[in-house]
Amino acid sequence: MSYVLEGQPIMGTRLTVKDQLAAHPKYFGKFLELMEGSGLFESIHNLGTGNENDNKACGGTNVSLFNTYHYTIYVPSNEAIEQLQKEGKLSSWEQVEADHEAGNTEKATADSLNILNFLKYHIQDNALYIGAQKESGDFETSLINTQTKRFYMLKSALKDDSIEVVDATGATHKVNKSTYVDDSGTKKELYNIQAREYLYDSKDATTATNLYTSSSAVIHLIDSPLSYGN
């Protein structure tokens, strides 16, 4: 789908998922670090045609998993991710690199895949907003079960002032209306954070005048990390 515009593309909100994660480093910083090392961010989108001229420039640094749809991203806090790392349930990219340099390539590969799967499992199809009309159901994540060849699911339900999420292990997690006050004294919300990501109808963003497509996402702080039973 293309949007023909006059002059430069009209972008609307220009804040990508990466922009929004970076805006809340005390809460989303560790998740952002994992995303940055994962290869899930891109500035050029490959359509997979085999023709480089078909590639599309991103309007910013985009999430490569997005595909003209709306998504929910559940972000565990810095402390929650650090706790997983202390318990040996999740590695860091620094540790993966250290293992690789030490010749522990099998461990480095396994830990790298575990990080990637962790991130994908926290990205859900369908944007769910606190305060919207109540909705519940089973929603696909971005993580494929290699045995069934189907996407892992999350059971998510919108409540009056929260979202309840049941993961593959049966554990229930919650998105609350969490807020904090930043260094300037401004109250910031850690739920219903909106992002939109654009693709130009050209591989060169500096000369593009058309938009090819866009995707949107809503980001929430979640009270504990999701698990698919790995």
Give the residues covered by each predicted segment:
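Mature, structured domains of secreted/extracytosolic soluble proteins
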Residues: 1-230
